Amino acid sequence: MSKDQSYVLKAWEVTVRKTQQAKKRANSVFGTVSVAPHTDNDTTTDDNDDETTTNRSSLEEFYHAERVLPNGDYYTGQWYDSFPHGHGKYLWTDGCMYIGDWYNGKTMGNGKFGWPSGATYEGEFKSGYMDGIGTYTGPSGDAYKGQWVMNLKHGHGVKSFANGDAYDGEWRRGLQEGQGKYQWSDGSYYIGEWKNGTICGKGSFVWTNGNRYDGFWDEGFPRGNGTFKWDNGSFYVGHWSKDPEEMNGTYYPSGNEGNLEWDPKDLFNNLSEYTICSGERVPTLPSQKKLSVWNSSKRIEKPRRTSVDGRVSVGVDRAFEKMNMWGNEIGEGGADMRKELDAELMRLDAEGLQSLKSSPVPMKLPKAGRKQGETISKGHRNYELMLNLQLGIRHSVGRQAPAASLDLKPSAFDPKDKIWRRFPREGTKYTPPHQSTEFKWKDYCPLVFRSLRKLFKVDPADYMLSICGNDALRELSSPGKSGSFFYLTNDDRYMIKTMKKSETKVLLGMLAAYYNHVRAFENSLVIRFFGLHCVKLNGPTQKKVRFVIMGNLFCSKYSVHRRFDLKGSSLGRTTDKPESEIDSNTILKDLDLNFIFRLQKAWYQEFIRQIDKDCEFLEQERIMDYSLLVGIHFREASVAGELIPSGARTPIGESEEESGPRLSRAEVDELLSDPSRWASIRLGTNMPARAERTMRKNDSELQLVGEPTGEFYEVVMIFGIIDILQDYDISKKLEHAYKSIQYDPSSISAVDPRQYSRRFRDFIFKVFTDDN
């Protein structure tokens, strides 16, 4: 596949010479070619709709073609059904060139793209995207070799910069994220965690003179607990920040040397000289190129077709004459443009270090749990189900359809509004070939969920990348109480839950009311649904697996140190794990709660209003057994991992009278009073608050909410209402009747929806209060 640069230049000279001839012959090229239009009958519910579509003409053939196109572009290579298909070479008149594999007019397989500047990409392509393993070499010497997903660096990759710097590590959506090592040209290097292309999290910076810093970082600078070590063995331990008033720590000399006259600010000044190179930008992206094959005035415009692996270029022009082969790079205004995170709002992003004990004092950061879930790789019992799911999602989301409207007709909510599609292994006109077993795919109320994704501001390309990218899904270790299985996308943004038929009926029955509710209340706390689907496996059992795609509430830049599932009932509402097994992933319950949460006044009023509205909606739909899922990130901790109460002082050196910086309560209040800076937070997401510790009385009377102690902690909160698909059916009525004989009826979860709503609100309004 690989061609040297001289070959590219020679080929370009050929096409330039032919360009002038092409302009004279433009009217004759493809003059007799026509293609009948076709439509994708996706709205049918017939299981055999694929078999009824028109097959390609038997007169069409696979042959080698060499053509100068109407605009002067040049193509030579294999040709089939009016498309480049097989191996071929395409040259644009501006100097760009592609040599490689094609499939139905799209780059698919291995290939090489060259720019007139001398820049090249050589590697794998998929459905027109740079996707797989590939190497990009810039004209000035920048080079990246590694994994790509839908035109973005995504996965593991190594990038060398023209100035001599180099990065080896993980990438996500075009930026460094995860674990990685960046080495500067002078030999100094950083190894540790990255976020959104910057040093963020836990890591170490090592200078060539032997000095090093180990600790936490934010936006490329030390922030939080850390240790600076000199090569002679001396070290400085403390809390680091760009704000001098927040800096505090202790110097520990080596041997008998005295105190060092050293200003920690010198470290920040030194680090300012070490910048992360952004690398070269491609002046003309391949996404800006078009193929002139479809640019004939005598051809009938065809609608977009689904690509061979199920993807569709999202956001491209619908006309094939403007069809792009690549999506926009991040940073070019594409859908994957990252919004600036709210780093100024929160002071720390400390990772969980120690286990939170139930002993009175001191409270500690909980033990950090492992990344949740088992990666579904080849050989996993649900590997083929995952492949089927991903193929179906690509088809559903990428399918050509009118622009989603928020004003829907009642017929869109009809439970009978569903689309069946067969996915044979060899592929069809509308589905790609695949290696999984044959299956059928069903979309429930597709127009409604397309509108919901638009309402929730979910970009289709980003949605597909999260669920259908190269990274596999993760299956949670154990099924839920309902027997459902849960799957997480690798970026933690979406959760997929298998559904019982009864739950599917409940969701479809309440879908119209749910849609109107979340549209009317932008800050609704009810869980967000993005799609409802079914996979029918081929075989004698004809097994059906229904599943719903939801937002993952705890997808946040902040580590969730504590998780609570709150219902307002007491029977069985405590964790049955021993304390030694409780970590940051453990979901605690009502009787485990030892905090009252205090929200800033404006947010508290909005919280009260929204809880009332959401509960009224659920009560009207006869839903019960839902809960408020709460996640807490503690913002302040000592070097030893002990939580620092709000207003507490941190010792410096050996003097107990010296005090460290005050916590940022006033700053948070000031920030919240500035509406222009509210964009980074919304109700239930990344909310600053104070958590007041509570203690339950040691007597026989059960206390659902403990007594406040006056001990406050600065926290970041994430919360939302989950499990909203359980109606008060006959099984729940029987459960209530049976348990009422044995226990206090008010302590049981299974109660009438009206009573459940009232009890739930009473409890939540005791746990959440105004921070006055």
From Swiss-Prot:
GO biological process, one term: pollen germination
Molecular-function GO terms, alphabetical: 1-phosphatidylinositol-4-phosphate 5-kinase activity; ATP binding
GO CC terms of this entry: apical plasma membrane; cytosol; pollen tube
Source superkingdom: Eukaryota
Biased composition (Acidic residues): 43-52
Ranges where the record places region Activation loop: 728-749
Keyword Lyase part of the UniProt annotation: no
Domain (PIPK) ranges: 377-768
MORN repeats mapped onto the chain: 75-97, 98-120, 121-143, 144-166, 167-189, 190-212, 213-235, 236-257
EC number: 2.7.1.68
Gene3D superfamilies the UniProt entry points to: 2-Layer Sandwich (3.30.810.10), Histone H3 K4-specific methyltransferase SET7/9 N-terminal domain (2.20.110.10), Phosphatidylinositol Phosphate Kinase II Beta (3.30.800.10)
Region (Disordered) location: 22-56, 646-665
Reaction equation(s) it catalyzes: a 1,2-diacyl-sn-glycero-3-phospho-(1D-myo-inositol 4-phosphate) + ATP = a 1,2-diacyl-sn-glycero-3-phospho-(1D-myo-inositol-4,5-bisphosphate) + ADP + H(+)
InterPro entries (UniProt xref): MORN, PIno-4-P-5_kinase_pln, PInositol-4-P-4/5-kinase_C_sf, PInositol-4-P-4/5-kinase_core, PInositol-4-P-5-kinase_N, PInositol-4/5-P-5/4-kinase
Alphabetized UniProt keyword annotations: ATP-binding, Kinase, Nucleotide-binding, Repeat, Transferase
PANTHER family the UniProt entry points to: PHOSPHATIDYLINOSITOL 4-PHOSPHATE 5-KINASE 5, PHOSPHATIDYLINOSITOL-4-PHOSPHATE 5-KINASE
Protein name per Swiss-Prot or TrEMBL: Phosphatidylinositol 4-phosphate 5-kinase 5
Organism listed in the record: Arabidopsis thaliana (Mouse-ear cress)
Encoding gene per record: PIP5K5
